[in-house]
Regions:
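Active-site glycine-rich loops that stabilize anionic/oxyanionic intermediates
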Residues: 34-37, 217
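Alpha/beta-hydrolase-fold enzymes
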Residues: 97, 103-186
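Short beta-strand/loop motif that positions the catalytic acidic residue
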Residues: 207, 213-215, 219
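N-terminal cap/lid segment of alpha/beta-hydrolase-fold proteins
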Residues: 1-23
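Conserved alpha/beta-hydrolase
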Residues: 46-69
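Catalytic nucleophile-loop/oxyanion-hole region of alpha/beta-hydrolase
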Residues: 36-38, 65-91, 95
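Short alpha-helix in the alpha/beta-hydrolase fold that links the catalytic acid
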Residues: 209, 223-232
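Catalytic active-site module of serine/aspartate enzymes centered on a nucleophile-bearing elbow/loop
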Residues: 237-281
């Protein structure tokens, strides 16, 4: 594994990892982690796709893992989108796929919709933060909007419990004892990405990148109806599947093997379909 740094536009250092070197790789996969976690929680995910012919990269988002920045804070949505863009510029663009989970899925879908990159072959959205199960109350939301203008970097406990992540006890124990996970979220991060999720749903029909959406049927953090609505609003480019007996992290739960194989088959289908079209030209 090779590690390197990428500098953000506000001079933070982001920790990037290249998981393998593969000659004649099928494609490149970049993993974007969720809130309060870090890229090394995806070691098994990276190894699976590396063992199946993909060159795999990942990075710790600002304020997470080994990257710099206040824990759980961002100056704004577009900083995260710019961070992702800078990371992608350092990667091979041969059959480039992006894989974003939860908060990382929110970053990814907004990157695709707002930046409109023309070099992405496909995207995988895992439990993408589009709608929250526990919506903020009107008064709480109003107070947060007011406070974020005064103290945007103020952080508080995100109240995320590992019990809601997975049915697998070992996954929960490792999360709770991981020194690189944290439970912080700033007012700015919450408001920007809460609104960005709503915006993405309204603009779902504008997505023009082949996308696979995955969600656990028993997710108590991010509402599966957001995934279903987004997919139904863009049947041309989006496919989705709901995994039963699965909580917030499909890649870490009872259907893990099914999730891996289903996603791999989809990636390979996109590659082979594009190759067939190229041969016909």
């Amino acid at each position: 594994m090779i590690s390197y740094k990428i500098q953000t536009k506000d001079q933070l250092s982001l920790h990037v990892q290249q998981w393998n070197e593969t000659e004649k790789a099928k494609g490149t996969l970049c993993i974007i982690h969720g809130l309060g976690e870090h890229q090394n929680r995806y070691t098994h995910v990276a190894k699976f796709y590396a063992n199946n012919g993909f060159q795999v990269f990942s990075y710790d988002q600002r304020g997470h893992g080994k990257s710099e920045g206040k824990r759980g804070h961002t100056p704004g949505l577009y900083y995260n989108l710019d961070d992702l863009e800078r990371v992608l510029k350092s990667l091979p663009n041969h059959n480039l796929f992006l894989y974003g989970h939860s908060f990382g899925g929110n970053v990814l879908i907004n990157f695709l919709l707002r930046k409109k990159p023309n070099f992405i072959r496909g995207a995988v959205l895992s439990s993408a933060w589009l709608r929250l199960v526990k919506k903020p109350k009107y008064l709480e939301f109003g107070i947060a909007k007011l406070m974020h203008k005064i103290m945007p970097s103020f952080t508080q406990n995100n109240k995320l419990s590992s019990v809601d992540l997975s049915n697998d006890r070992q996954v929960r124990l490792e999360y709770d004892n991981d020194p690189l996970t944290h439970n912080q979220i700033s007012l700015r991060l919450f408001l920007d990405f809460y609104l960005a999720g709503k915006w993405a749903l309204k603009n779902a029909d504008k997505l023009s990148v082949k996308t696979l959406m995955l969600h656990g049927a028993d997710d108590l953090l991010v509402c599966k109806s957001g995934t279903e609505l987004f997919a139904h609003k863009n049947t041309k480019y989006v496919e989705y599947t709901i995994f039963e007996d699965t909580k917030h992290e499909p890649h870490n739960d009872n259907k893990q093997a099914d999730v891996f194989e289903y996603t791999l088959a989809w990636l390979e289908k996109i590659i082979s379909t594009e190759a067939s079209h190229s041969n016909l030209k």
